[in-house]
Regions:
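Internal metal/ion-chelating core segments
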Residues: 176-272
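Bacterial Sec-dependent N-terminal signal peptides
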Residues: 1-44
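Outer-membrane beta-barrel translocator domains and adjoining extracellular loop/strand segments
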Residues: 69-76, 113-119, 148-155, 189-198, ...
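Short Gly/Pro-enriched turn/cap motifs at secondary-structure boundaries
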Residues: 80-81, 156-158, 199-201, 248-249, ...
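Extracellular/periplasmic loop regions
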Residues: 276-377, 441
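Outer membrane beta-barrel
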Residues: 82-188, 208, 212-216, 221, ...
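Flexible, solvent-exposed coil segments and beta strand-coil junctions
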Residues: 68-71, 105, 142-149, 180-192, ...
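Beta-barrel outer-membrane channel/assembly domains of diderm bacteria
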Residues: 43-139, 166-170, 251, 260-272, ...
Length: 469
């Protein structure tokens, strides 16, 4: 019996040893698997390269319609107009680390018009960038800085704005510093090859410095801007140049100022101030000194994400008298200093009323009495995908006028946007201008007393192809 018990104990010990041995084997095996598995996964991730190249093709189709009456210095038979306009953009993008290439072709035409009203390369540029924030860009670029008051795309004008340029800069750690260099030439001009009067923008040369800083842990952004713009002076036809009194030449004007954006919760305060100096030129006229300025302030209050309110004031300096052509003109007062501020290349319809009676559509004889714009409005999203806005403008000249009141009129704007999907949006709007006798005298058109304008825009912008490798 003892022998049998001893035998059973030996067998039990052997079984326990085997179990212990097997347990150790399984422990070692699982440890190895757990150790190898992540390593294998990491090795696999290392072997599969992250896509370095990306190509995107997209289409931007704009169908735009307008019906207007009044607002422009035209005869009674041209006082009303209705038309439909189409704009097609084909957009191509290529990206890889350190390089981006962007091209946009644009076709613009009025429906029913034979041929194309405009077909051009709206944008075409290449941008080289480094990991430390420095970059260089060359080509035709649609520029947009700050609130677009001085430099913007002005996209509502359908043809929009772009510039042929070289841009270098730095972006990082809250700092943005850009330097822009432009030089335009007209290859059809074989006489001295200096005059430039057609192209992306109407200037000979432009140099721009822009700096922006976002304060850390504080809702404040500050920008500084300096521009030096060379405009061609003299007659367009070189054969008519008078080298003794009015030769072809380039005159320069400067723009400098700043923009501030303070945006705590539920409130955004914006302010800007700019000055213009240098020389103002016009065809067949001597250059005049420029002493102009503008200032603006705007508050946007958003109690919730669903609605908000705006209130603000713009002041653009103006001339006291009409300009006089070179050589003088009997009965007109000669003045050598231009005080009328020019917004240059900004998105003008964004600030002084979407119809923009004052800068897109100039006064008679180019007279610029300046502008005061007091505005108040509201915006909101009453239902999903629908945005609505209402804005009132009180408009007046900046300078006092002889025998006329400064008040130009009152403008009411109503707008709505409906987003059918992420790439389909319908916008509609209506503007009513209640002009005064001052507006009529400056525009020389009685129809400005009751200018009205309704419009719609349908934008379809799908991405048709996208790939990475």
């Amino acid at each position: 019996m003892q022998t049998q018990n001893l035998y059973l104990n030996i067998i039990t010990m052997e079984i326990d040893k085997k179990k212990s041995f097997n347990s150790k084997i399984w422990h070692i095996l699982w440890s190895t698997i757990l150790f190898i598995s992540p390593t294998g996964t990491w090795a696999q991730n290392d072997s599969v390269k992250t896509p370095q190249n990306e190509i995107d093709f997209s289409i931007n189709l704009l169908a735009h319609g307008e019906a207007c009456g009044g607002g422009l210095p035209k005869g009674a038979e041209e006082n009303k107009s209705r038309f439909l306009l189409g704009r097609m953009r084909i957009i191509a993008d290529y990206k890889r680390p350190g390089l981006q290439v962007h091209a946009v072709t644009q076709n613009l035409a009025i429906w029913g018009m034979k041929g194309n009203q405009a077909f051009n390369l709206y944008e075409g540029w290449a941008k080289i960038s480094s990991k430390n924030g420095f970059f260089a860009q060359v080509g035709r670029v649609a520029l947009s800085y700050d609130d677009e008051r001085i430099i913007g795309t002005n996209d509502f004008a359908t043809a929009a704005l772009s510039h042929d340029l070289i841009r270098v800069g730095y972006e990082g750690h809250g700092h943005q510093a850009h330097a822009i260099f432009c030089y335009n030439q007209n290859d059809n001009n074989i006489y001295n090859n200096t005059y430039y009067d057609d192209g992306a923008q109407y200037y000979k040369t432009m140099q721009t410095l822009w700096y922006h800083y976002d304060f850390p842990k504080f809702p404040l952004g500050v920008s500084l801007l300096f521009m030096n713009i060379g405009m061609q002076a003299g007659k367009i036809n070189p054969k008519e140049w008078d080298y003794d009194t009015n030769p072809a030449r380039t005159e320069y004007q400067q723009m400098f100022g700043g923009y501030i954006n303070y945006h705590p919760k539920h409130l955004t305060l914006e302010a800007s101030y700019y000055r213009q100096t240098g020389k103002q030129v016009a065809i067949s006229m001597n250059a005049s000194d420029i002493r102009a300025w503008m200032a603006s302030v705007k508050a946007t209050i958003t109690p919730t994400d669903r609605y908000g309110f705006i209130v603000g004031y713009d002041h653009l300096s103006g001339d006291d008298y009409m300009p006089v052509p070179y050589g003088g003109d009997i009965g007109l007062i000669r003045h050598d200093v231009v005080k009328g501020f020019s917004p240059l290349y900004g998105s003008r319809t964004k600030f002084y009323g979407i119809l923009d009676f004052f800068y897109e559509s100039a006064y008679i004889n180019g007279f610029t009495p300046g502008l005061q714009n007091v505005f108040i409005g509201a915006f909101g999203d009453p239902v999903k995908k629908l945005s609505c806005s209402f804005t009132y403008h009180y408009l007046a000249t900046a300078t006092a006028l002889t025998n006329l009141n400064r008040t130009l009129g009152h403008s009411i704007e109503i707008g709505a946007d409906y987003r059918f999907s992420k790439d389909i949006t319908l916008s509609i709007g209506y503007t009513q201008m209640f002009g005064t006798e001052t507006m009529c005298r400056l525009k020389q058109d009685e129809s400005n007393k009751n200018g009205r304008w309704g419009w719609f825009s349908l934008v379809i912008s799908p991405t048709v192809f996208s790939t990475k490798w």
